[in-house]
Curated annotation (Swiss-Prot):
This is Protein TolB homolog. InterPro entries: 6-blade_b-propeller_TolB-like, PD40, Tol-Pal_TolB, TolB_N. It is found in: Periplasm. Its main location: periplasm. Keywords: Periplasm, Signal. The lineage of its organism: Bacteria, Pseudomonadati, Chlorobiota, Chlorobiia, Chlorobiales. Residues 1-30 form the signal peptide. NCBIfam families: propeller_TolB. Gene3D superfamilies: TolB, C-terminal domain (2.120.10.30), TolB, N-terminal domain (3.40.50.10070). One of its GO terms (cellular component) is periplasmic space. One of its GO terms (biological process) is protein import.
Length: 440
């Protein structure tokens, strides 16, 4: 059996509201083929000149400045861009075309692409027209129109930002995704959600008890979590469309659910003795026992194709990361460095697994390892307890909990450990973040 500090650390510190995008994009310029940005030699980011949005008659300039700030902050958050201020002589007209933009001036400051837009309002509706030009050729690469109400300006701006990322990189962005996490700001441990950048925090549960380890199904229909309202940890599954919560009653304890796909999830049960991993359907019915060992098995996380599952087991003595293969039904040990490896998180790209290591000096640090056991890399160091890593949907970032400034808060970093910074600032402590898949 694992020592109690491991169980306590994992369980006590281990809805997403899938609101559809209210902005409805309408193509201005057809872009049937993806354009993949080529970075300049020696550069690790895309040099993008972002201009302040223009406004039509009757539209508040402050609204355009707000939209520009939302786009700039969002693109900067991704870590993909070097954002440049436009030169003073970049435009000869508020009507954007290749003939009214000074591409030589843009090239002189190192810009590879130029993003600009127009904001207009009429009858309570606002329209954002966004365009991206290639500096080298002066050609329009991308353009779209987004409509909504003024209260939806953030969604409109992020819809444009997400399309810019997808068009220039060929990959989906984090815009529209959300993060679920645990906070005690209300006095008890409840589940909260926030946008990808820490904005729009919402409390999702109000049990006035303890809720832990939130996990959203890939289709956004269900939220699974560990529920203590009955006095012991039990699996709870909430159907988000109806708000109906099903508590799966089993003898013993249940902790730490994870979804294999939109209709199957795994969790740890102890009703047959040892704490083992089981596969369930979305209603909570057990379909299959996955592990059988003399030690505790917990913390499942699935490969993107659902064919493999990483988990934590003490079968070798101390907790280590193992990988279960559904085709063979066998498990193999993945980690051999470190005596206390926990909280695995499989990258959505499929090539790496992040996890936490409890080190002898008292620090907890986050590492990543290739799925074949090679390439062990430490991402955090000399910053207290860093735990519960969770990948962004595009695999470019990791959100995690850290007490580096005292109380545990949420932080984000790039997948290589660079640019570690706080995600949000709210009262209480925040732990156990889980980054959702793309909103649908």
């Amino acid at each position: 059996m694992l020592p109690m500090p491991f169980f306590r650390k994992h369980v006590t510190c281990a809805l997403l509201l899938c609101t559809p995008m209210l902005a409805l994009p309408h193509p201005i310029i057809a872009a049937d083929t993806e354009y993949i940005a080529i970075r300049k030699a020696g550069s690790t980011s895309i040099a993008l000149v972002l201009d302040t949005f223009e406004v039509t008659t009757g539209t508040s300039p402050a609204l355009a400045r707000q939209a520009t700030t939302l786009v700039r902050d969002g693109l900067d958050f991704t870590g993909l861009f070097t954002l440049l201020q436009p030169p003073l002589n970049v435009k000869t007209s508020s009507l954007f075309s290749s003939s009214t933009i000074n591409f030589k001036a843009l090239d002189s400051i190192g810009g590879a692409f130029y993003a600009v837009g127009t904001l207009s309002s009429s009858g309570g509706e606002i329209t954002l027209d966004g365009q991206v030009f290639e500096v080298a050729t002066g050609k329009v690469l991308f353009g779209k129109r987004y409509r909504g109400t003024e209260s939806q300006l953030r969604a409109l701006s992020h819809a444009f930002s997400g399309d810019v990322v997808e068009f220039l990189t060929g990959k989906k962005s984090v815009f529209g995704s959300q993060i679920v996490f645990i906070s005690n700001k209300s006095g008890s441990k409840e589940i909260y959600s926030c946008d990808f950048d820490g904005a729009n925090v919402h409390q999702l549960t109000n049990f006035r008890s303890i809720a832990l380890t939130p996990a959203l199904s890939p289709d956004g229909a269900y939220l699974a979590f560990t529920d203590f309202t009955g006095g012991k940890p039990a699996l709870a599954i909430r159907e988000l469309a109806t708000g109906k919560t099903t508590r799966v009653a089993k003898k013993g304890n249940s902790i730490d659910p994870a979804w294999r796909n939109s209709r199957e999830l795994a969790t740890t049960f102890s009703f047959e003795g040892d704490q083992e991993l089981y596969l369930l359907d979305s209603a909570g019915a057990v379909k299959q026992r996955l592990t059988s060992s003399s030690g505790i098995d917990l913390s499942p996380t699935f490969s993107p194709d659902g064919r493999k599952m990483a988990f934590v087991s003490a079968r070798s003595g101390n907790p280590q990361i193992f990988v279960y293969d559904f085709s063979s039904g066998k498990s193999q040990r993945l980690t051999f460095s470190g005596r206390y490896n926990t909280q695995p998180a499989w990258s959505p790209i499929g090539d790496k697994i992040a996890f936490s290591t409890w080190e002898s000096g008292g620090e907890i640090n986050i590492f990543v390892i290739n799925t074949d056991g090679s390439g062990l890399t430490q991402l955090t160091t000399q910053s207290g307890e860093n735990e519960s890593p969770s990948w962004s949907p595009d695999g470019r970032m990791i959100v995690f909990a850290s007490n580096r400034q005292g109380v545990k808060k949420l932080y984000v970093m790039m997948a290589d450990g660079k640019n570690q910074r706080p995600l949000l600032a709210i009262g209480g402590e925040q732990t156990q973040p889980s980054w959702s898949l793309f909103s649908r």
